[in-house]
Amino acid sequence: MAAALQVLPCLLRAPSRPFLWGPPVARMTSGMALAEQARQLFDSAVGAVQPGPMLQRTLSLDPSGKQLKVRDRTFQLQENLYLVGFGKAVLGMAAAADELLGQHLVQGVISVPKGIRAAVELAGKQEMLLKPHSHIQVFEGAEDNLPDRDALRAAQAIQQLAERLTADDLLLVLISGGGSALLPAPIPPVTLEEKQTLTKLLAARGATIQELNTIRKALSQLKGGGLAQAAYPAQVVSLILSDVIGDPLEVIASGPTVASTHSVQDCLHILNHYGLRAALPRSVKTVLSRADSDPHGPHTCGHVLNVIIGSNSLALAEAQRQAEVLGYHAMVLSTAMQGDVRRVAQFYGLLARVAAACLTSSTAERPLEEEAKLHQLAAELQLPDLQLEEALEAVAKAKGPVCLLAGGEPTVQLQGSGKGGRNQELALRVGAELGKQPLGPVDVLFLSGGTDGQDGPTKVAGAWVMSDLVSQASAENLDFATFLDNNDSYTFFCSFQGGTHLLHTGLTGTNVMDVHLLVFHPQ
């Protein structure tokens, strides 16, 4: 059965450590020089959403140290600060918060992926580890990004801390991607196993992520605003690192500090639609029957301040600024790139051909037929924030190199048994598209990298290609089509030109989905 490639939990890169692009090469070709600049842009995007800088931009203390400012809100500090967190990037976020606010912190509890502290220590990322005498207790769980008993114990500790708070207290909540699996708290008498079984049955029958989240929230004590309700009447400040397109607060980690807008009737409609209502465990029926209304209604979240402190759009904005410093005409195309990787690759390939023609030809010579195809493909991808026409106009007016940036999370349907990830597969497919016809007197480079530093079950973040990929691969007797058919992009890039096209970042400590760069440099 086809399944979407998933990015595995991965984290942590010291901001000062440079990215590496495979083994050293004897000489720096023009393509490698262009790739080095693209690397700098990717580096800047990831650096902008590192835990330390994010927290420092968001939190500040007044000179007396007795007031905490969060954006334009101020909170009094008087031995009343507590902290909880859950997610793949939360260990580094907690370390940064502890560094800034540790003297005011009474107690903290965080739930992080199994093995993360050992991985951080092994990588030498000491700045992302809590100090030995920190007041923050760390629970590791959710092995393979699945809720388990360890994560359940962490959720119970977080709930107990929240329920002890008073109106004089302030709770700082740290949230990142992966937080849902790290905060399992089914409403009794529903068990963790029963909730997981129901979720798996829904997924197997084709339920959407939105439908799955609706069911999860209805059966959870902490999701869908449940954590905010548990902490009431304390003030709650939730700092959120978004790994979801559009940054919907109710979706990230299933919205523990955001009031749910779904009712029990919505849940029953979903269960009926997938033919599961009659087969529900008695415990689930009990919970749904006694929930006459949404238990985490909007009236319970007036004491909460939710702040997105890191996102794909913030990362791309920084990369755009750095591109302009390097002399590029730079523009962000979209932060919502999604859909099947084949269609996304076709979009980028067609965009490259049209943009290259705009850059090197007069207005009268623009490829109108291909432009029409490009707009049609863009409409099929349904990218809500796509700035396509604006980008083409900017390219046509540009007098020098151009950099188009995008972000999001395409999906790969597995058909083979090879090794790779969505970023490497996208890069390889775009390389194939770029080789379909000459692009004129312009060098074109495409880069796709995961901001978490690990693309699928590999130790690289992604890869980059140029328009001569097909001819260069043929010269090395590499049939890229065979690698694509087997979803074996990692093996291809390891073999191609000594692995120099792989993007090695190491563990980054953050995740705001993927970054795509399409770079044009007139010859």
Swiss-Prot record:
Family of this protein: Belongs to the glycerate kinase type-2 family.
Gene field: Glyctk
InterPro entries: GK-like_C_sf, GK_N_sf, MOFRL, MOFRL_assoc_dom, MOFRL_protein
Domain of life: Eukaryota
Protein name, UniProt field: Glycerate kinase
Enzyme Commission number(s): 2.7.1.31
Pfam families: DUF4147 (PF13660), MOFRL (PF05161)
GO cellular component: cytoplasm; cytosol
Modified residues (N6-acetyllysine): 200
Leader sequence segment: none
A Gene Ontology BP annotation from the UniProt entry: protein phosphorylation
PTM annotation (Phosphoserine): residues: 60
Alphabetical UniProt keywords: Acetylation, ATP-binding, Cytoplasm, Kinase, Nucleotide-binding, Phosphoprotein, Transferase
Predominant location category: cytoplasm
Reactions listed under catalytic activity: (R)-glycerate + ATP = (2R)-3-phosphoglycerate + ADP + H(+)
Species: Rattus norvegicus (Rat)
UniProt GO MF annotations: ATP binding; glycerate kinase activity
First-tier enzyme category under EC: transferase
Lineage per the UniProt record: Eukaryota, Metazoa, Chordata, Craniata, Vertebrata
Location relative to the cell: Cytoplasm
PANTHER family: GLYCERATE KINASE (PTHR12227:SF0)
